[in-house]
């Protein structure tokens, strides 16, 4: 079956969050099951630099407002770093910018993001309409708000052609990021005027790309079963809960997986020493090396907490800031890798300066350091307000770094709380309910108590490391879904 994945970023060439990890891992997993998978991505410089054997498929003629001065071309080639065949939209005026993929150097969204990512959705739909005369997908799978207009453009093309072109699947990676734009930009997109209403993209006087994906896709997925239920309620529905309840029969949750080729302590070239769940001596070496690298007191008996995250309120990082003084006083160490809210960055930096042998902070993102940090820590904190799936807790499980998570979304689907009655059965981490510093502190203190009981700690650690969170099962679920929408 021919599958087209439409996404804005792909690991390892371009990554701002977990979307890139999924986009990089799902196509090879589907191919291993016999699917013929290609991706379509914007021509950001990092992606173009990774494209080999490129040929020009077409000169693009999208709706007039999307056309920039130098036009746009669709290239086809291979992204060896991602192990996938790819269509790349080569349009420098759209995608070659001084800032990041979505925001400028001052972290302000680009004024023409509706054009930049409308073009991505349009190209995905046109590929189902014969843009490449030698290959057309049976299913178009669009990811997050950036590609969300693909199902809308596909529906419009099918109406114009009077026949079905392809099935469509739309995946919500985070409902909070919807791709909102002023209503007057709708006319730039070249969609039928009838789509600019409540049964379409219109959202309280604006347009929402994500709403377009949710409304027009044949099937909708989220990245965990619990999140699929949560977003149908007002608290986490972000104003779209009514639409999601209406489409409940078409909505399902499929957990993200961990790419074993990237995240595997048994063969990870980015960590000081490899290890397995049966032989954990290498993890102790990773911890000692990390403590030395960060200037922390080199003591194996001190539990080391880590965070790898965007610094936002949604991720619960303000709770970490509130909890850390008490946790450090109670004998924990802490290390963070992340960036985001400027105020939080300053607060974490100040805390590390106040406790130089107990806390360390690195702002930004460094993939190699993320591996060293997770491998060398004892516990990884994911205290999110809401969490569609979460990947860092899965990396923690894989590396024997027990997760401390809040009972929401994909976190509750992937981490089983360690309590006396569960230690011998399914415990893999520590789960708390209250979205508060006290809730986080309580879970960390429970973790420290278990850390002191070495045999019980090892039992939970090894159980976590053997959890089956690879991509094969998730890919099978997606393939079954594709078969349904292609029928």
UniProtKB/Swiss-Prot annotation:
Pathway: Glycan biosynthesis; glycogen biosynthesis. HAMAP family: Glycogen_synth. One of its GO terms (cellular component) is cytosol. The gene is glgA. It is an enzyme of class 2 (transferase). Its EC number is 2.4.1.21. It catalyses: [(1->4)-alpha-D-glucosyl](n) + ADP-alpha-D-glucose = [(1->4)-alpha-D-glucosyl](n+1) + ADP + H(+). It comes from Leptothrix cholodnii (strain ATCC 51168 / LMG 8142 / SP-6). ADP-alpha-D-glucose binds at residue 15. GO terms for molecular function: alpha-1,4-glucan glucosyltransferase (ADP-glucose donor) activity; alpha-1,4-glucan glucosyltransferase (UDP-glucose donor) activity. PANTHER family: ALPHA AMYLASE DOMAIN-CONTAINING PROTEIN, GRANULE-BOUND STARCH SYNTHASE 1, CHLOROPLASTIC/AMYLOPLASTIC. Belongs to the glycosyltransferase 1 family. Bacterial/plant glycogen synthase subfamily. This is Glycogen synthase. It holds the Pfam family Glyco_transf_5. GO terms for biological process: glycogen biosynthetic process. Synthesizes alpha-1,4-glucan chains using ADP-glucose.
């Amino acid at each position: 079956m021919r599958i087209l994945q439409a996404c804005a970023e792909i690991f390892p060439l371009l990554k701002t969050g977990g979307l890139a990890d999924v986009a990089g891992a799902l196509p090879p997993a589907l191919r291993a099951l016999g699917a013929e998978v290609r991706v379509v991505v914007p021509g950001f410089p990092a992606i173009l630099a990774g494209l080999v054997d490129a040929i020009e498929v077409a000169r693009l003629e999208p709706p007039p407002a999307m056309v920039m001065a130098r036009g746009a071309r669709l290239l086809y080639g291979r992204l060896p770093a991602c192990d996938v065949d790819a269509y790349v939209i080569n349009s420098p005026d759209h995608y070659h910018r001084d800032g990041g993929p979505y925001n400028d150097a001052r972290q302000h969204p680009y004024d023409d993001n509706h054009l930049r990512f409308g073009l991505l959705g349009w190209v995905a739909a046109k590929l189902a309409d014969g843009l490449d005369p030698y290959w057309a997908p049976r299913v178009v799978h669009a990811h997050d708000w950036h590609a969300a207009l693909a199902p809308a453009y596909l529906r419009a093309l099918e109406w114009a052609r009077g026949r079905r072109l392809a099935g469509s699947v739309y995946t919500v990676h985070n409902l909070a990021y919807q791709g909102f734009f002023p209503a007057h930009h709708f006319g730039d997109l070249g969609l039928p005027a009838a789509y600019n209403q409540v049964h379409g993209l219109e959202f309280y006087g604006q347009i929402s790309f994500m709403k377009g994906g949710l409304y027009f896709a044949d099937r909708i997925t989220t990245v965990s079963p619990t999140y699929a239920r949560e977003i149908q309620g007002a608290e986490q529905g972000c104003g779209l809960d009514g639409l999601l309840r209406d489409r409940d029969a078409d909505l399902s949750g499929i957990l993200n997986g961990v790419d074993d080729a990237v995240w595997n302590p048994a063969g990870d070239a980015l960590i000081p020493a490899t290890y397995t769940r049966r032989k954990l001596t290498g993890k102790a070496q990773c911890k000692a090396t990390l403590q030395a690298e960060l200037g922390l007191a080199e003591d194996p008996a001190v539990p080391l907490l880590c965070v790898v995250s965007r610094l936002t309120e949604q991720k619960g990082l303000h709770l970490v800031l509130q909890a850390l003084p008490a946790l450090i006083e109670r004998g924990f160490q802490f290390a963070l890798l992340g960036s985001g809210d400027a105020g939080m960055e300053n607060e974490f930096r100040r805390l590390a300066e106040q406790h130089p042998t107990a806390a360390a902070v690195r702002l930004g993102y460094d993939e190699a350091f993320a591996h060293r940090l997770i491998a060398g820590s004892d516990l990884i904190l994911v205290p999110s307000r809401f969490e569609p799936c979460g990947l860092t807790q899965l990396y923690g499980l894989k590396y024997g770094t027990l997760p401390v998570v809040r009972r929401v979304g994909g976190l509750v689907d992937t981490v089983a709380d360690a309590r006396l009655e569960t230690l011998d059965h399914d415990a893999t981490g520590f789960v708390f309910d209250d979205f508060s510093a006290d809730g986080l502190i309580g879970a960390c203190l429970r973790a420290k108590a278990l850390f002191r009981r070495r045999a019980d700690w090892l039992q939970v650690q090894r159980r976590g490391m053997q959890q089956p969170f690879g991509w094969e099962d998730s890919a099978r679920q997606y393939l079954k879904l594709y078969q349904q929408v292609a029928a």
